[in-house]
Design a protein with these regions (language model features):
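AMP-forming adenylation/ATP pyrophosphatase catalytic core
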Residues: 2-30, 48-52, 87-89, 103, ...
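Non-catalytic, surface-exposed connector residues within folded enzymatic/regulatory domains
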Residues: 65, 94, 191, 210-213, ...
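Active-site catalytic microenvironments for nucleophilic, acid-base chemistry
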Residues: 37-44, 204, 267-270
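Alpha-helix boundary/capping and short turn/kink residues
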Residues: 137, 141, 167, 206-210, ...
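Mid-to-C-terminal catalytic subdomains of enzymes
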Residues: 171-214, 218-221, 225, 232, ...
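Core alpha/beta nucleotide-donor-binding catalytic domains of modification enzymes
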Residues: 1-199
């Protein structure tokens, strides 16, 4: 039961076959296709490390326990080691979706001690939705690069081997082999922004421009490549400024405004701090570079309120405090 050639090629190209692999398995169509695809590689001796599936039960939906049972049954039917973890959403002050994602990442980080390669089933359509969502919400150049193919998490890597594969290819594979998968009804709720983009915006766009999804995806890849080049050049010239613990006002005041803002963003990124939007960046410029108040400060936080920052100035040095 081979996954179609395109998806199978993408999976194999984007993973390390010698690492132990853990699949984030919700039971939905995407993660089901990924699990079966990796299982096919395993039985064909193209995946040398261990293969396991991890289901995270958020306990939100009334069907949550039934979904967990389904995932366990599927994994065991394939002879794949199965893990499940229950997480509890506590906060009511922020998006449930954001908190659920943060909790999942903590679980993945814990499992990275034993499984150095954690695979998630994001696909091309997810990438397109992410780019559009960020554009509509407001983002910079880095935001339009979308979802990363891979990144470090804990002691391993988080990889999305299907990121270049359209969802239709995954659905066709599942249907052609009569593979069951779960449907989360919340994904149909168009009061949720991403669902609205998926169910209403993209179909309308593609009814006019049939290749729109691929073009948006290619655009995000090109943006990523261009940003990498610019970052390298920028660091070669200005790296000594943003790698320090503080910014020196006298070294910034005579620079053009776009360059000053880029330096501030890179400085904050280097120290793994929340990146402010354009409005706050302009406020930072006015507060610290275009005036000289000794008690000035600018404060902001991440969109999920998990971390906040205050910038202050002491004579010629602009420094940060995490709150």
């Amino acid at each position: 039961m081979a996954l179609n050639d395109l998806a199978a090629k993408e999976i194999f190209q984007n993973i390390d076959p010698d690492l132990d692999t853990l699949v984030g398995f919700s039971g939905g169509p995407d993660s089901t296709a990924l699990l079966f695809g990796l299982h096919q590689l395993k039985i064909n001796n193209r995946l040398n490390g261990k293969l396991a599936a991890l289901h995270i039960n958020h306990g939100i939906n009334s069907q949550a326990n039934a979904w967990e049972s389904h995932c366990k049954q599927v994994a065991e039917s394939l002879g794949i080691t199965f893990f499940s973890e229950h997480v509890t959403i506590k906060s009511k002050s922020k998006s449930i979706e954001i908190e659920a994602r943060n909790l999942r990442m903590e679980v993945f980080k814990a499992y990275s001690r034993d499984y150095k390669q954690i695979c998630l089933a994001h696909h091309l359509d997810d990438q397109v939705e992410t780019v559009l969502f960020r554009l509509f919400r407001g983002t910079g150049l880095r935001g339009i690069t979308g979802i990363k193919l891979s990144r470090i998490i804990g002691e391993g890597f988080l990889i999305r081997p299907l990121l270049h594969t359209p969802k239709d290819a995954l659905i066709d594979y599942l249907k052609s082999h009569n593979i069951d998968y779960l449907i989360d009804e919340s994904n149909l709720d168009q009061s949720i922004d991403r669902n609205f983009i998926r169910k209403s915006v993209m179909p309308l766009i593609q009814s006019r421009w049939s290749a729109a999804a691929n073009k948006i995806f290619d655009f995000s890849k090109l943006a990523h490549e261009e940003i990498e080049i610019l970052d390298t050049l920028f660091e070669n010239v200005y790296g000594h400024l943003f790698r320090s613990e503080s910014l020196i006002k006298s070294e910034l005041v005579n620079l053009d405004s776009p360059l000053r803002r880029k330096l501030i963003r890179h400085w904050l990124e280097f120290h793994k701090l929340p990146i402010p939007n354009l409005k706050i960046l302009i406020e930072i410029e006015k507060t610290f570079l275009d005036s000289s108040s000794p008690n000035a400060e600018v404060q902001w936080s991440r969109s999920d309120d998990e971390q906040g920052v205050i910038l202050r100035i002491n004579k010629n040095e602009i420094y940060f405090e995490v709150i």
